[in-house]
Structure formats: C-alpha cells, structure tokens
C-alpha cells in the first residue's frame, strides 16, 4: 500500500524477541537488562497474525530480527507458516549466527531465503571484546555451512567504529573477492548504547569510499538502504548504509514490529502503535496497521539533531 507521501510500503521487519546471547557494545548494556515477562512479549501466534494482516495490505517482504531471532523457540514454525502466504515473496533474517550452523539447513527448507550476519570484527579477540564474550569460530562455521547448502545471498553487516574496528575495512571488503558474500558497512547511530560511542567513534561512509578509488558504483534499487559498489574482481557487492550522512527516507519502504507488539512506522521516531490490543480482531488489526502505514512520517531528523528520537534500544526495536 501507499503511505500519505506516496511511498510504496511493502517491507515488514519483525523483532521476534528482545533477548540476545551477545552484548554488543553499541546495542546492549553489559548488565542491568530487565527481562520482560512473557505476557509483555508477542507470542508466535500473535506475530503471525500481524504478518498475515500486513500481507493483505501489500507487504511482500519479511525480515525476522531480534535481539537474536534464533533464540525464539518457534522461529522455524514462524518461517514455515510465513512461507505459505502466497503474497510473501521474500523471507530473510538478521542474526549474529552463533546458533545458525545447526539450524540453517532446516530453516532453508522451511522457507528462509537469505541471511544477514552481524559481524563487526574478523579478529577473534576483538570480536569477543565487541560482543562481550562471543565465539567468532561459531560465526565462521555458520557462514561456511550457509554457503555449503546454497543459501544466497549471504550478507555481512558491519558497524564501523573509528578506533575500534575501522582498521579492518579492507579485510571485510576483500571477503567479496574470495567468497560469494556481500558486505554492508553501517554507520554508527546515536541510538541506545550507540549514543555513548557516537562522538568518538562515528565514521561516515563517504570517508571510507573516498579512500578506495577502485570501487565501482553498482546500480541500486530506489528503496534500497544501501549504496552499492564492487571491485572489478568482486563476486558480490559492497554496500554502505548511511543513516547519518545520507538518509534514505524518500525511498523508505518499511515499517517495524517490535517484540512488544508495537508497530513503528520509522526507526527513529517516537511514534509507535500498540497492536497487541487488536490481534484478537482481524478487521481491527488490519485497520490499525493500515492507519499506521498511511501515517508514516516523511523523514527523520537524526542528521540535524545528532540523536534518534526513539527511546528504545536497538535490541528492543530490531536491528
């Protein structure tokens, strides 16, 4: 469907849980996280009702996120049932891949089309530091398994932070020369824990691109959040997602469902609508989703204000 600004909204990002098995420095605090009661988190059946209703309004792309989505007990069932909705053409997942190796083959059979893997360092000790305890070898094994079963495309999402991992930019880029893997560099955002790092660690996509004159621009879909490039010898693309230096609001085609059941028309807006009160009435749920999508804000003002209006952490909204 179209929002009131004429944008076609066909993409729903679904945070299935706010829980995670890592504690990445820009996403979650190291401690003090209060686990929400199950009654305050959407159940699998409720999530599916929202997905089904959104599909009736023209949503044909679904991405499951977290927290860490593979923690959800019914994630396989959710993917399978979503794949049976005829109008849904693309089912993707963003994961830290710690649990992916043993699950990816069955998830692919269930209907998962592609995965984005959050990976902010290729160095074992640094990865452990950034994630506060993660085992990078589990991620590497998950990538290998995903490649071996033909999961494609596989994209690596890397948040670049000055003085923390920016010395690995070339190493990440070179992955696209060796493997059929895309890499996405994401600008650090002043949201949640990222606010504490932003002033010292933000680095713009433009700064990275300017240092790599051999990058070749690739034609990009209008609704894409990434500007795409590749090297002459690349097997896949290198993307730059630049919410701070080059916002993509004019072509935005997505809304987000949080694990608490609120629908956010914009990641960086305070506005959100609680859908949990409507899931028992299909018509009321459809109407409320329709209304929220139609009233999606024209744009965010994070570039000018240097801060997201969202009061939630990224793990609560969905990465």
Swiss-Prot record:
Residues 4-219 form the Radical SAM core domain. [4Fe-4S] cluster 2 binds at residues 249, 252, 266. Its EC number is 4.1.99.22. GO terms for biological process: Mo-molybdopterin cofactor biosynthetic process. Its cofactor is [4Fe-4S] cluster. S-adenosyl-L-methionine binds at residues 26, 67, 118, 189. [4Fe-4S] cluster 1 binds at residues 20, 24, 27. Binds 2 [4Fe-4S] clusters. Binds 1 [4Fe-4S] cluster coordinated with 3 cysteines and an exchangeable S-adenosyl-L-methionine and 1 [4Fe-4S] cluster coordinated with 3 cysteines and the GTP-derived substrate. PROSITE patterns: MOAA_NIFB_PQQE, RADICAL_SAM. It is an enzyme of class 4 (lyase). Pathway: Cofactor biosynthesis; molybdopterin biosynthesis. It catalyses: GTP + AH2 + S-adenosyl-L-methionine = (8S)-3',8-cyclo-7,8-dihydroguanosine 5'-triphosphate + 5'-deoxyadenosine + L-methionine + A + H(+). GTP binds at residues 13, 63, 94, 155, 254-256. The keyword Transmembrane does not apply. It holds the Pfam family Mob_synth_C. One of its GO terms (molecular function) is GTP 3',8'-cyclase activity. Keywords: 4Fe-4S, GTP-binding, Iron, Iron-sulfur, Lyase, Metal-binding, Molybdenum cofactor biosynthesis, Nucleotide-binding, S-adenosyl-L-methionine. InterPro entries: Aldolase_TIM (IPR013785), Elp3/MiaA/NifB-like_rSAM (IPR006638), MoaA (IPR013483), MoaA_NifB_PqqE_Fe-S-bd_CS (IPR000385), MoaA_twitch (IPR010505), MoCo_biosynth_MoaA/MoaC (IPR050105), rSAM (IPR007197). Belongs to the radical SAM superfamily. MoaA family. PANTHER family: MOLYBDENUM COFACTOR BIOSYNTHESIS PROTEIN 1 (PTHR22960:SF0), MOLYBDOPTERIN COFACTOR SYNTHESIS PROTEIN A (PTHR22960). Monomer and homodimer. Catalyzes the cyclization of GTP to (8S)-3',8-cyclo-7,8-dihydroguanosine 5'-triphosphate. This is GTP 3',8-cyclase. It comes from Clostridium botulinum (strain Okra / Type B1). The gene is moaA.
């Amino acid at each position: 469907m179209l929002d009131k600004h004429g944008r076609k909204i066909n993409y729903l990002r679904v945070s299935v849980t706010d829980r995670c098995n890592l504690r990445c420095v820009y996403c979650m605090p190291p401690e003090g996280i209060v686990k929400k009661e199950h009654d305050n988190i959407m159940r699998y059946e409720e999530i599916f009702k929202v997905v089904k209703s959104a599909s009736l309004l023209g949503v044909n792309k679904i991405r499951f996120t977290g927290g860490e989505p593979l923690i959800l007990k019914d994630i396989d069932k959710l993917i399978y049932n979503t794949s049976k909705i005829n109008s849904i053409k693309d089912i993707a997942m963003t994961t830290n891949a710690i649990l992916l190796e043993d699950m990816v083959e069955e998830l692919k059979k269930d209907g998962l089309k592609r995965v984005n893997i959050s990976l902010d360092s290729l160095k074992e000790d640094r990865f452990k530091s950034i994630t506060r305890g993660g085992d990078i070898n589990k991620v590497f094994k998950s990538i290998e398994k995903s490649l071996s079963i033909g999961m494609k495309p596989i994209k690596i999402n890397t948040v670049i932070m000055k003085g923390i991992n920016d010395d690995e930019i070339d190493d990440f880029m070179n992955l696209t020369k060796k493997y059929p893997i895309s890499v996405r560099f994401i600008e650090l955002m002043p949201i949640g824990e990222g606010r504490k790092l932003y002033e010292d660690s933000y680095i713009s996509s433009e700064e990275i691109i300017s240092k790599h004159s051999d990058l070749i621009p690739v034609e990009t879909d209008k609704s894409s959040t990434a500007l795409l490039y590749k090297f002459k010898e690349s097997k896949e693309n290198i993307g730059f997602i630049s919410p701070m230096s080059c916002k993509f609001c004019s072509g935005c085609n997505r809304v987000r469902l949080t694990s608490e059941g609120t629908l956010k028309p914009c990641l960086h807006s305070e506005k959100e609508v609680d859908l949990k009160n409507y899931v028992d009435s299909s018509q009321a749920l459809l109407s409320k989703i329709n209304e929220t999508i139609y009233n999606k804000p024209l744009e965010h003002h994070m570039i000018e204000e240097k801060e997201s209006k969202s009061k939630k952490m990224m793990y609560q909204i969905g990465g």
